[in-house]
Regions:
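Metal-dependent phosphoester-hydrolase catalytic domains
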Residues: 21-52, 199-203, 214-302
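Structured beta-strand-rich core segments of catalytic domains in phosphoester-bond hydrolases
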Residues: 30-53, 92, 96-170, 266-267
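Active-site-proximal loop/helix segment associated with metal-binding centers of metalloenzymes
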Residues: 166, 171-180
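Alpha-helical scaffold elements lining the catalytic groove of polysaccharide deacetylases
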Residues: 185-197
Length: 302
């Protein structure tokens, strides 16, 4: 990961890379192995899933195993084996730098995964962005993009909702790839503010995970403000193998109304990020909170 932070030479190289990158005027949401392509809902106009009559199988409230991993676009050897292995023991996987080439597409189809992708851009004609994979279908998803102010390449965020077996509450899972190359924190603040606006209405259990690119104290302070506003908690590790840049961890999992049962950071060579694994169970008090009614999203004025 440190090789991405060689300052000026890296920025020049990144600007050159944009010649191969195409940025669409609209977001693309590619979901499940059928490869249906549609424009996702705006997170600012999302209809809260409480109002949808969707009866998908839910997650087990006693065991929700999450893996968060930046896949490095599959540039390193061994990622397919590692991803397939992790998928067998996790219920939800939040993936950043997913590169939907034939290798990843084939892996998703072979394993019959349920997945949703919010495309940030196309690299050499192939979609790249954030992807959330689960053993249950997302009952609703929305996404947005934020442009890197220096290299002008988008970063994507995806918000997905899942049923929880035996409960009216829905689990919100937000998957974010944080803006990276900035001289200050203004653009970073704007991305986090958009995420907050997109999910602050949800009063149920919540996971916010991703590659936050918190390589400075100022960036981490912005993230912790978001965490505090959402009444979320962070994970502490006795053995911290999380990927660090400039001495700061950049990948994080935050949660609410869930209780961590176990957690681990895996050491891998198949990406420049080490995956974070955590198993949650639904807190008892989260099961007793009444479902708040949210009006349907408006068609024109939102």
């Amino acid at each position: 990961m440190l090789n991405r932070f060689n300052s000026l030479p890296l920025i020049i190289a990144s600007l050159t890379l944009t010649a191969c990158v195409s940025v669409d005027s609209k977001r693309e949401d590619v979901s499940n192995a059928l490869h249906d392509v549609k424009e996702p809902e705006s997170c600012q106009a999302i209809t809260v899933v409480n109002n949808k009559d969707i009866h998908e199988q839910g997650l087990n409230p006693e065991n929700i195993a999450l893996l968060n991993w930046n896949l490095y676009k599959g540039n390193n050897d061994g990622w397919q084996k590692d991803l397939s292995s992790f998928a067998q023991s996790h219920d939800v996987m939040t993936i950043q730098e997913a590169y939907l080439d034939d290798k990843l597409s084939g892996l998703l189809q072979t394993n019959n995964f349920n997945w949703t992708m919010n495309t940030a851009f196309h690299l050499n004609g192939t979609a790249a962005g954030v992807m959330t994979v689960a053993n249950s279908k997302a009952i609703q998803s929305c996404g947005f993009q934020n442009i890197e102010p220096i290299i002008r390449v988008p970063k994507a965020t995806l918000v997905s909702y899942y049923n929880i077996d035996g409960h009216d509450r829905k689990l919100l899972v937000a998957n974010i790839h944080g803006i990276n190359f900035t001289l200050g924190v203004t653009a970073y603040q704007e991305q986090l503010a958009q995420l907050y606006d997109s999910i602050q209405h949800h009063d149920g259990p919540m996971i916010v995970a991703g590659d936050f690119n918190t390589w400075s104290d100022d960036r981490m302070a912005e993230v912790m403000q978001l965490v505090e506003k959402l009444s979320m908690s962070s994970l502490e590790y006795r053995v911290n193998n999380k990927t660090h840049v400039f001495g700061n961890a950049i990948d994080h999992v935050f949660y609410r109304q869930l209780q961590p049962v176990s957690k681990k950071v895996w050491q891998v060579s198949s990406s420049d990020h080490n995956p974070i694994s955590v198993t949650f169970k639904l807190k008892p008090e989260a099961r007793l909170i009444a479902v708040r009614e949210i009006p349907e999203a408006c068609a024109d004025s939102c």
